[in-house]
């Protein structure tokens, strides 16, 4: 892996981590197109650039997080189910990382997005929960529980939490905001655990540190831009376009990767 690859993959991570399109699927496809093998170095690189994306959320919502203790309680409630199931099922989760799984889950998730949005349109429903302050502890727990589905590659953490948020009565924008914020404890924990499990690989590849940092920085900058634009988009439009995109990408996976 060189600096150009690091920049490209960092951009891909920043673009897709918080969109409901599966960053894992895009990273696998991008690595394939760049001719990169799934080596231990690439796995460590993915951990670092994911950290860059998380820091973008912290930076974006820092003032809100600093002032709203009640929000932290909701995030903790949402994080607990994922933490428990993720810790217990860590070894089994890694066995799901197959291109075929990613492809099928992309398509299934896309169909679900379209169905949910069309259903909401039919009954003229846009969500009763219009602000983060109105999100209840029960809603936070259910949305957090849905993150467990995102342990299956291709599902998308943001995708599963946003869909569940919509089904729980959150507006499109609030569902997206809560999904972003819930990523902070969830992704920090996942990144820390992966780093711990792969500590020896990091030590063995210290010469790649600058490449890791370049990728992480690119992911941070791009994620900041994407979060701002995405929130503006969902305040005006539905998630149907993302559902269609997922189905197209999943089909490309089935044709190209498999």
Swiss-Prot record:
The keyword Cell inner membrane applies. It is an enzyme of class 3 (hydrolase). It comes from the Bacteria. It is found in: Cell inner membrane. It is a multi-pass membrane protein. InterPro entries: UppP. One of its GO terms (biological process) is regulation of cell shape. One of its GO terms (molecular function) is undecaprenyl-diphosphatase activity. Keywords: Antibiotic resistance, Cell inner membrane, Cell membrane, Cell shape, Cell wall biogenesis/degradation, Hydrolase, Membrane, Peptidoglycan synthesis, Transmembrane, Transmembrane helix. It catalyses: di-trans,octa-cis-undecaprenyl diphosphate + H2O = di-trans,octa-cis-undecaprenyl phosphate + phosphate + H(+). Signal peptide: none annotated. NCBIfam families: PRK00281.1-2, PRK00281.1-4, undec_PP_bacA. Belongs to the UppP family. Catalyzes the dephosphorylation of undecaprenyl diphosphate (UPP). Confers resistance to bacitracin. This is Undecaprenyl-diphosphatase. It comes from Campylobacter fetus subsp. fetus (strain 82-40).
């Amino acid at each position: 892996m060189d600096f150009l690859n690091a920049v490209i993959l960092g951009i891909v991570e920043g673009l897709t981590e918080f969109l409901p399109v599966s960053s894992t699927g895009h990273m696998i496809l991008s690595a394939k197109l760049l001719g990169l093998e799934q080596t231990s170095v690439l796995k460590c690189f993915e951990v670092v650039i994911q950290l860059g994306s998380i820091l973008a959320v912290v930076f974006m919502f820092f003032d809100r997080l600093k002032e709203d203790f009640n929000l932290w309680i909701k995030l903790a409630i949402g994080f607990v189910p994922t933490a428990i199931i993720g810790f217990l099922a860590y070894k089994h989760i890694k066995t799901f990382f197959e291109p075929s799984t990613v492809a099928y889950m992309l398509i299934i998730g896309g169909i679900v997005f379209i169905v949910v949005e069309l259903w909401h349109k039919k009954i003229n429903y846009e969500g009763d929960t219009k602000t983060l302050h109105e999100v209840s502890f029960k809603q936070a727990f259910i949305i957090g529980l849905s993150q467990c589905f995102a342990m299956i590659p291709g599902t998308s953490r943001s995708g599963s939490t946003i869909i569940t948020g919509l089904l729980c009565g959150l507006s499109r924008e609030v569902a997206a905001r809560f999904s972003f914020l819930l990523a902070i404890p969830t992704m920090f924990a996942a990144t820390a655990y992966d780093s711990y499990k792969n500590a020896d690989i990091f030590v063995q590849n210290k010469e790649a540190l600058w490449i890791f940092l370049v990728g992480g920085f690119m992911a941070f900058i791009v994620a900041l831009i994407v979060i701002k634009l995405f929130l503006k988009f969902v305040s005006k439009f539905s998630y149907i376009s993302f559902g269609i995109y997922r189905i197209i990408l999943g089909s490309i996976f089935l044709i190209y990767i498999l």
